[in-house]
């Protein structure tokens, strides 16, 4: 985005806002990230991004780490800026209605067809009756490591009443295995495929945490690694784990 803004010296200023601290995001009901606004218009919502692009319903710029996806985003963003600078903000607003930004709400733990790193299948039925915490992460994500270390302490605290699934995206298997062995073997580690990520509404940022109550209903979704993560999640788990 900074690269695109730099094409318009003196006309476009790039501003980065932290997730959870954006008035524009609150105004549009944006609950995840990334999201891109141009002159007050939401031109790319979180649902347009994602780490997988080969499944039905994938966003326009998924898979995001693909060079072609990033090139398309830059072209589209340049076009939006050009229209606004030409006095055609109405076109941009018409092409990006506010209701299109509605987040995908995940009501309950989806069906799972995964195999963990030890070769054991992970199935939703096997998790029934327990609180389930699902963490999507990546080996190249610095905040993910500290969050994963914390998950190990949660497993020690709650034992078998809490199932923790650490699902890696966009990460080489040897590195995933190495990190899993170094961090906590009691957490169930697996590599998420496209279908799994899509069943969670696609994953547009890491880390992303889902907490499900013993009945399987979604209790909390946490995007990123906010400074109050422990304060958000620990009391919730205390109330759910019985």
Predicted features and spans:
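Conserved hydrophobic packing residues within short motifs/helices of P-loop NTPase cores
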Residues: 134, 165-167, 210
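C-terminal partner/receptor-binding element of secreted or periplasmic proteins
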Residues: 64-97
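Short, ordered coil/turn segments that flank beta-strands lining enzyme active or ligand-binding pockets
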Residues: 38, 117, 214
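Conserved redox-active cysteine motifs that mediate thiol-disulfide chemistry
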Residues: 136-153
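N-terminal "domain-start" segment that seeds a small globular fold
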Residues: 90-124
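Thiol/disulfide oxidoreductase modules built on the thioredoxin-like
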Residues: 25-33, 41-72, 181-186, 192-238
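Conserved segment of the thioredoxin-like fold in thiol-based oxidoreductases
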Residues: 1-20, 25-35, 39, 154-195, ...
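Short pre-active-site segment immediately N-terminal to redox-active cysteine/selenocysteine motifs
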Residues: 130-132, 137-140, 205
